[in-house]
Amino acid sequence: MRYAGAALLVAVVCAIPTFGQSAGQPEWTTSSYNPQRDAWQRHEETITPQNVAGLKLLWKLKTDNKTMGMQSFREPLIVSGIGTPAGAKTLAIVAGSSNEVFAIDVASGELVWKKPLKWSSQQPQEAGEGRGFICTNALSATPVITPAGAKERTFYVLTTDGYLHMLDPGTGEERQAPVQMLSSVYGKAYGLNLVNGVVFTITGQGCGGVANALYAYNTATKKVSVSSPPQGGLWGVAGPAIGTDGTIYFESGDHPYDAKAGLLSASVQAYTFANDTLTLKDYYTPSNYEWLNKRDLDLNTTPVVIPYQGRDVIVGGGKEGRFFLLDSKSIGGADHETPLFRSELLANANVNFQTEGTWGSFAAWKDRGGVQWVLAPNGGPTTLKFPINYGATPNGGILAFKLEEKNGKPVLSQAWQSGDMMTAEPPVVANGLVFVLAGGEFTGQTNDVEGGLFSAEERIKRSIPAKLFVLDAQTGKELYSSGNQIASFLHQAGLSVAGGRVIFGSFDGTIYCFGIK
C-alpha cells in the first residue's frame, strides 16, 4: 500500500513562545502541548516519581460517540477557570469522530456539555464510514484553544465537512459562523496549531479529493491560505510544528519527486507566511529518497522543535527506522540533502511499511542537569540494544535519546528503550515521568493470506485493550501500569496531562481519567 506524501515548513513573521501556559492551573491547549510539539508538560507537580505507583482510575465516562472506521476520539484539551452556567471549572474537551464535542468536568467526571456540530457544506453528507481504514470520513484533527491569558478563550475544531468551528469552551455555543477551511468534504486533516491568531493544519492521503497541503486561517483577516503545488500525503498526527522563530515544520510520505516543479516527497519543506500568502523557503530531502519512496517508508511523523544553542534544532524520522537533526538556519544545507545528524538504522530491519519504525510524533524535555532528551515511539524490534533496556521488544515501545555534542556537532545518543508495548502511542513527559499508552491497535495493512487490504472491521477485531504505562524519564523503568482497567484499544487518540490528571479516550467511546487522589 502506498501513501503519497510531502512535508512542509512555514515561517510566520513573529516569534512564537515555546509554550503558552497560565500562571495558575496547568493546562493542555493543543496537540503535543505546545506549538513546538514537544509534549512536555512543564507545570505538573501533583504526580511525582515517588507517588506514581498510587495512580488510580478516578473516573470514566461512557459517551455515545459514533466511531468512524478506526477513529473515535482525538487528544483531549484540558483548560482551567472556564466559566460555565454552573460556575468556573477545569474542563477536558474532547472531539469525537462524528463531529461531536464533549466537555467533561475534570473534578467530577460529569458531562458539562455536548455539541453536535451541524453540517455546513453544500456538498451532501455521506451515510457510511468512507473507504477502508484510510479515508473513514472521520474528524481526524486534534482541536486547539486560545492560550490562557487571551482576551477570549475560543475552541477551534475542524469538522469533516471541511469547516472550522469556533466555540465558547464554557457552553459549546458557536462564537461565529463556521468558516470553510478545506476545499471539499472528508479531507483528512491533522492536529490544528494556533500562533499569532492563525490556525494551521495539514492534510494527507488524498481523502475527499482535498489537496494535500498546508492550510492557514487568519482569524484577523478571515482569509484562508493554501500552499502550492499540492503534495503527497502530509500525515504527522500532531499536524505542523512551529519553531520559536515562526517557522512551521512537517514531514511527508511517498509521492513522485520533482524539486524543480516543487514536488518534494519524503522531505521537510519550509514556507513563509506573510500577507495571507504561503511561499516556499527551504527544504530537506534525504539522499535515499528514491528508495524510501519505492519501499513506502514515509517520513510520517510530526517533527519536534528544540531551542538549542541559539537556533532551533528539528528532530524527525519515520518508518525507515532512522532519526535526523536539522538546523533551522539551513535545514538541508546547500544541496538540500545534508542534515546536522542522521542516525544509523535503529529499527525496521525488516523494511516493513505497515507496523515498524516510528509513527505519530515525538517528545522532548530537559532535565534539571541541563541534559536535553528526545523520545520517540517505535514499532517492532530495534536493530541493537540500547544502553538501558528491559528485554526483547517484538511489538516495539519507546526509544530515548540524549541530544549531545560530539566533535563539535549535535548528535542523538541512544539512552534507553522501554519494555515491550503493543503499538506505543506518542509519549508525554511531566515531572520526570514518561506517560505512554500502549494503544493495542493491530496496525497490519495487507492481508498476506487472503490478499488485498485488511478492512477497518478486521483490524478492529485483531486489536487488544490499551494499557497506560508510566516510566522513569531518566531510565525508562516501568513505575506504573494500568493493567486490565482499559476495556478497548485506541487509534491515534493521544493522552493529555495537567493538574495531576491523565486523560484520554478509547475506541469504545469511553473517556478515562487517571490521577492521584
Where are these regions (language model features)?
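Bacterial N-terminal signal peptides
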Residues: 5-17
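Short, surface-exposed beta-edge/turn micro-motifs
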Residues: 10, 89-91
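Blade/loop signatures of beta-propeller domains
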Residues: 22-58, 77
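Extracytoplasmic/lumenal domain signature
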Residues: 45-70, 83-88, 99-137, 145-186, ...
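General structural concept
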Residues: 74-80, 92-94, 102
